[in-house]
Amino acid sequence: MASTTPSTYKQAVFKEQGAGLTLEEVALTLPKRDEILVKVEACGVCHSDHFAQTNLMGGGFPLVPGHEIIGRVAAVGEGETVWKEGDRIGGAWHGGHDGTCGACKKGFFQMCDNEQVNGISRNGGYAEYCIIRREAAVHIPDHVNAAKYAPMLCAGVTVFNAMRHMKIPPGELVAIQGLGGLGHLALQYANKFGYRVVALSRDSTKEEFARKLGAHEYIDTSREDPVAALQKLGGASLIVSTAPVPEIINPLIQGLGVMGKLLILSIVGGIEVHTGLLVGKGKSIWSWPSGHATDSEDAIAFADLHGIDCLIEEFPLDKCNEAFAAMMEGSVRFRAVITM
């Protein structure tokens, strides 16, 4: 262990199902082979962290949440040759893979049959230090702001990676539904991908903001029929659904043009879809599960090159419960980030 590394550190932990976070001091342990000890600079607070609190994915307790981690390498496991002390490093939702399953053999490491998830199946980044696996470690540029870029490791890579895999050519009409943590980034990425971007939201006061982020058109769905408005524009080649509003799924399908794709990035639960809305015009419904380490590096490099701005509110570690509550209430604009 490096001489500057302390023997103890603080972490925020869920001790039992449904409870709030407990801030505690614990002993620092060395990383094992294929592990990296990270001195955390910032960790985003994502709605998926609620899965840790409720044990929805079976991570158990106690558990430190957080999967939008940026920091510096404090120590490396035995035999490590790529990472060294002081390197800028990140940890995302994807926390590790076996490299042998069918998904891994196809390069979809974030879909691994035995995937580990930071902050869900292993302790995450609501802490001064955390340990991440080397195969899931993300190279982070030295010059980027840790708090601003931490959410890129979930919200950013999710919208970036999903949209690029839809293979929509530049110049096509792309609509973004929702202007929250995912949506405000999706608007910016879509604009920089070269699309004609339409923002869909239920609030007329957000139009100016949406246009500043890169929207060429704005549809207030509380005042205007989104189907008619999108069809008047020619029908969307892609609609990205970022807000969990199940009742809007069928109307969004009707807003697609011929061979249009509806990309669902928010978990809305069970929905009914009229298949007749799909078959006649070759429309389809898609989803995409975040990304692996290289995808995260691509999302960050693209954001850095094009000036994509993640809007955040910062909270110190001892205000972790306030940060979590603001995220759950939807009062934060637009991503809460815990800074050390």
Swiss-Prot record:
Disruption phenotype: Strongly reduces the production of patulin. Its EC number is 1.1.1.-. Substrate binds at H67. Keywords: Cytoplasm, Metal-binding, NAD, NADP, Oxidoreductase, Zinc. Zn(2+) 2 binds at C101, C104, C112. It catalyses: neopatulin + NADPH + H(+) = (E)-ascladiol + NADP(+). It comes from the Eukaryota. It is found in: Cytoplasm, Cytosol. Binds 2 Zn(2+) ions per subunit. NAD(+) binds at residues 47, 178-183, 198-203, 206, 265-267, 289-291, 297-299. Gene3D superfamilies: Medium-chain alcohol dehydrogenases, catalytic domain, NAD(P)-binding Rossmann-like Domain. GO terms for biological process: patulin biosynthetic process. It is an enzyme of class 1 (oxidoreductase). One of its GO terms (cellular component) is cytosol. Zn(2+) 1 binds at C46, H67, E68, C154. One of its GO terms (molecular function) is alcohol dehydrogenase (NADP+) activity. Pathway: Mycotoxin biosynthesis; patulin biosynthesis. The keyword NAD applies. Alcohol dehydrogenase; part of the gene cluster that mediates the biosynthesis of patulin, an acetate-derived tetraketide mycotoxin produced by several fungal species that shows antimicrobial properties against several bacteria. PatD catalyzes the conversion of neopatulin into E-ascladiol. The pathway begins with the synthesis of 6-methylsalicylic acid by the polyketide synthase (PKS) patK via condensation of acetate and malonate units. The 6-methylsalicylic acid decarboxylase patG then catalyzes the decarboxylation of 6-methylsalicylic acid to yield m-cresol (also known as 3-methylphenol). Belongs to the zinc-containing alcohol dehydrogenase family. This is Alcohol dehydrogenase patD. The gene is patD.
